From Swiss-Prot:
Its EC number is 5.6.1.7. Disulfide bonds: none annotated. One of its GO terms (biological process) is protein refolding. Keywords: ATP-binding, Chaperone, Cytoplasm, Isomerase, Nucleotide-binding. GO terms for molecular function: ATP binding; ATP-dependent protein folding chaperone; isomerase activity; unfolded protein binding. ATP binds at residues 30-33, 87-91, 414, 479-481, 495. This is Chaperonin GroEL. It is found in: Cytoplasm. Its main location: cytoplasm. The lineage of its organism: Bacteria, Bacillati, Bacillota, Bacillota incertae sedis, Caldicellulosiruptorales. The keyword Isomerase applies. InterPro entries: Chaperonin_Cpn60_CS, Cpn60/GroEL, Cpn60/GroEL/TCP-1, GroEL-like_apical_dom_sf, GROEL-like_equatorial_sf, TCP-1-like_intermed_sf. The gene is groEL. One of its GO terms (cellular component) is cytoplasm. It holds the Pfam family Cpn60_TCP1.
Length: 539
């Protein structure tokens, strides 16, 4: 076991603070509409230029092990805020730094860290309650555009995200992909899409676009492998008599069965497209059931005692249109019973709440979106690779911010909500005494910090701006982009309540942990041994 180095008391806390400051000072230059960028070196490829707090925080490792621990504590604040709210990571870092700085001053002057911690916690509870009271519900597309524009620092991106949210509703999935061109565009996929295409290219109906479009088809959904035509012959005969088209979703269609379907398609006897079932294992069963509910059909499975040879038309699904491409299948306007679809959506929502695995949650959300509203894809375009990565990060932040805003509402942006919470905190401070009061005062001072930093990044005197906002009526804040004092809601400068709340809670949690530290243990770096001298015959 390697030897350890140990620091105590003030020396330990100061080492941690140096690390906190190195990380926070790097991150906070990005705050606000006039925040600058940070360039990150990459082992491979061009450096990455970013404006995103958590991405910068994750890149920072310091040489001194004690300082590095301090930096990692604040990094945890940024990534926790990012995980919960998806945005507000820089604000959280600035708040944590301010609380740690003020707290350490008071501890050095003899305050008791454990009682300070109590005061900090009480103060944060009051501030969070006050932020919730200020919160307004998101009303319509305009509010969403504001939230996304502020988060991404770009009006174009704001409009794009708002369009996407409007099209696919709150339950829909919005994915961000890299575009082949320099344009940033929005594509909406209506209906249910899954990533399986036609089994044979002979099944296409439009050879120019290489896709098969079936209008008003029957849909056979099964988890079996179909290899002999005898299995589905009775069903095919019924469909030919009706003069209808057929989509087969099965584990696989091969051999004689596939050959017969292709020959019939080429002769014009029966228009049929076969695709493999999406997903694997239990997830496949669940997705087939989703498709069945969406289209009003049944999954033909031996587990349910159903045999392919005895399938009736009433057990098949229906849809207004099915579009099958080389790698995707889209079912538009399935004929399922709306009440059953609703029940299925509720069941998936419950599973999302209960699951502990991020991977499972993501897959469940995809299933939910496919049932509920469809999928929007934002194709991000830029002139260079570096710009593309930076733009993609900003769009992802904007998406997270809009989802958070829809969940818990919006508050005045630009650090104004935190300043507006100070009067409520002052009432609490009056009722506290001793070090508990000092703890609450630490939070009070920290609440000014995000606005001060936004003003300083805009090249102005932070303290002057903070005092002016304090004297202004509630809801009036500083528009750093145009350098004027405005009603933040009217000007469309808003932050999601969830983002502001999470930032202050996580910052206080990390600050309280660091302030109550009395000793720090780190591994002693091993001295490199000199390599042995080479033997004479090696030359």
């Amino acid at each position: 076991m390697a030897a350890k180095m140990i620091l105590f008391d003030e020396e330990a806390r100061r080492a941690l603070e140096r690390g906190v400051n190195k990380l926070a000072d790097t991150v906070k230059v990005t705050l606000g509409p006039k925040g600058r960028n940070v360039v990150l070196e990459k082992k491979f490829g061009s450096p990455q230029i970013v404006n995103d707090g958590v991405t910068i925080a994750k890149e920072i490792e310091l040489e001194d092990p004690f300082e590095n621990m301090g930096a990692q504590i604040v990094r945890e604040v940024a990534s926790k805020t990012n995980d919960i709210a998806g945005d507000g990571t820089t604000t959280a870092t600035v708040l944590a730094q301010a609380m740690i700085r003020e707290g350490l001053k008071n501890i050095a002057a003899g305050a008791n860290p454990m009682i300070l911690r109590k005061g900090i916690q009480k103060a944060v509870d009051v501030v969070v309650e006050e932020i919730r009271k200020m919160s307004k519900k998101v009303r319509g597309k305009e509010d969403i555009t504001y939230v996304a524009s502020i988060s991404a620092g770009d009006e174009e991106i704001g409009k794009l995200v708002a369009d996407a949210m409007e099209k696919v509703t709150n339950d829909g999935v919005i994915t961000v992909e890299e575009s082949k061109t320099t344009e940033t565009t929005l594509e909406i996929v209506e209906g249910m899409q899954f990533d399986r295409g036609y089994i044979s290219a002979y099944m296409v109906t439009d050879t120019e676009r290489m896709e098969a479009v079936l209008d008003d088809p029957y849909i056979l959904i099964t988890d079996k492998k179909i290899s002999t035509i005898q299995d589905i012959l009775p069903l095919l005969e019924q469909i030919v008599q009706q003069g209808r088209k057929l989509l087969i979703i099965a584990e696989d269609v091969e051999g004689e069965a596939l050959a017969t379907l292709v020959v019939n398609k080429l002769r014009g006897t029966l228009q049929c497209v076969a695709v493999k079932a999406p997903g694997f294992g239990d997830r496949r069963k669940a997705m087939l059931q989703d498709i069945a509910i969406l289209t009003g059909g049944q999954v033909i499975s031996e587990e349910l005692g159903l045999d392919l040879r005895e399938v009736k038309l009433s057990q098949l699904g229906r849809a207004r249109q099915v579009k099958v491409q080389k790698e995707n299948t889209i079912i538009v306007d399935g004929a399922g019973d709306p009440s059953e679809i609703k029940a299925r959506i509720q069941s998936i929502k419950k599973q999302i709440e209960e699951t502990t695995s991020d991977f499972d949650r993501e897959k469940l959300q995809e299933r939910l979106a496919k049932l509920a509203g469809g999928v929007a894809v934002i194709h991000v375009g830029a002139a260079t690779e570096t710009e593309l990565k930076e733009k993609k990060l900003r769009i992802e932040d904007a998406l997270a911010a809009t989802k958070a805003a829809v969940e818990e509402g919006i508050v005045p942006g630009g650090g104004t909500a935190l300043i507006n919470a100070i009067p409520a905190l002052d009432k609490l401070i009056e009722s506290l005494t001793g070090d508990e009061k000092t703890g609450a005062m630490i939070v009070r001072k920290a609440l000014e910090e995000p606005l001060r930093q936004i003003a300083e990044n805009a090249g102005l005197d932070g303290s002057v701006i903070v005092n002016k906002v304090k004297e202004s009526p509630a809801g009036v804040g500083f528009d750093a982009l145009n350098e004027r004092f405005v009603d933040m809601f009217e000007a469309g400068i808003v932050d999601p309540t969830k983002v502001t709340r999470t930032a202050i809670q996580n910052a206080a949690s990390a600050a309280a942990m660091l302030l109550t530290t009395e000793a720090v243990v780190a591994e002693k770096p091993e001295k490199e041994k000199n390599p042995p001298a080479p033997a004479p015959d090696m030359y």
